Regions:
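SAM-dependent transferase fold signal centered on methyltransferase-like domains
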Residues: 1-275
Length: 275
């Protein structure tokens, strides 16, 4: 139905491209529109608003996610100019601000994977936690303690709100600030499991991840990797990690998290470190 509606204003190829380039987050749609179609952005927005039942707002993403606070610029195309919504995933509820704090629905499979790996009694340091989605999913059913850190004050406040609206088996401590400084001051050798969810800058923060992780603990090291063959991306990530790490590491596994561009992937390598 949506494709047919879009094809009333676009070609079949253009509508296919557009459908693959939008995210629905709660009652908000965010769409990335190719330059060639920008002249039709308003009618695209109205069509999406009318065809997707629960949607109240359609935004055009006019910039990449950027800056230390990991925010993006959004332009309202149709509906209410409100960037805050409620999003549900795996029996958890989240209040998100899609413009002013980092959030991606395309990481849901990875969030579920980390939650399943988490064990009762673990201490987890989530170095770039955003609104707390990985943290909350880990603490939903497991009696763990999560230090949920983010530099963006809006993200940290949303994390606190999300902690309050979810019934958790574990405990989450939301901390606003620079992860490296917080680790140095408060969280040295504290973590059984550490997440480095800033793939474009993980190399800069690897030493901090090592510093917070206990000997025998696990680091989930996320990065962006170029690979001519998709099947090689995980192996290339492992090789990259080995090249830059300063600690004895056992590779437990690696995988593609998602594609982020042509021959360009967000990947993760899981490593057990020994100090």
């Amino acid at each position: 139905m949506l494709k047919k509606s879009l094809e009333s204003i676009l070609t079949s190829e253009e509508s296919d491209e557009l459908i693959s380039a939008f995210d629905q987050i709660g009652n908000i749609i965010i769409v990335r529109i190719p330059d060639a179609l920008l002249s039709k952005k308003k009618i695209i927005g109205e069509t999406l608003l009318n065809q997707v039942k629960i949607v109240k707002s359609v935004f055009y993403q006019s910039s990449a996610v950027e800056g230390d606070f990991r925010t993006r610029n959004l332009e309202i195309l149709a509906g209410e100019d409100n960037t805050e919504t409620e999003y549900k995933e795996f029996n958890c509820k989240f209040i998100v601000d899609v413009e002013n704090a980092f959030f991606s629905p395309r990481l849901s499979t990875e969030r579920e994977r980390i939650a399943k790996l988490t064990q009762d009694g673990e201490v987890i340091v989530n170095m770039f936690a955003g609104v707390g989605m990985f943290s909350i999913m880990a603490a939903k059913k497991k009696k763990c303690t999560v230090y949920s850190i983010d530099l963006n004050p809006i993200a940290s406040k949303l994390c606190e709100r999300n902690i309050a609206i979810n019934k958790l088996a574990g405990e989450i401590i939301s901390i606003n600030g620079d992860a490296s400084k917080i680790i140095q001051d408060q969280l040295m050798d504290k973590s059984d499991r550490t997440l480095t969810l800033l793939p474009e800058r993980s190399d800069e923060f690897l030493d901090s991840a090592i510093n917070t992780t206990k000997s025998g603990g696990i680091i989930h090291y996320y990065s962006h990797i170029h690979a001519d063959k998709k099947s090689e991306a995980g192996k290339l990530t492992e090789e990259h990690y080995k090249k830059i790490t300063s600690v004895k590491s056992e590779i437990l596994g690696s995988k593609i998290v998602r594609a982020v561009g042509p021959r360009y992937y967000q990947t993760v390598v899981d490593v057990k470190i020994t100090k």
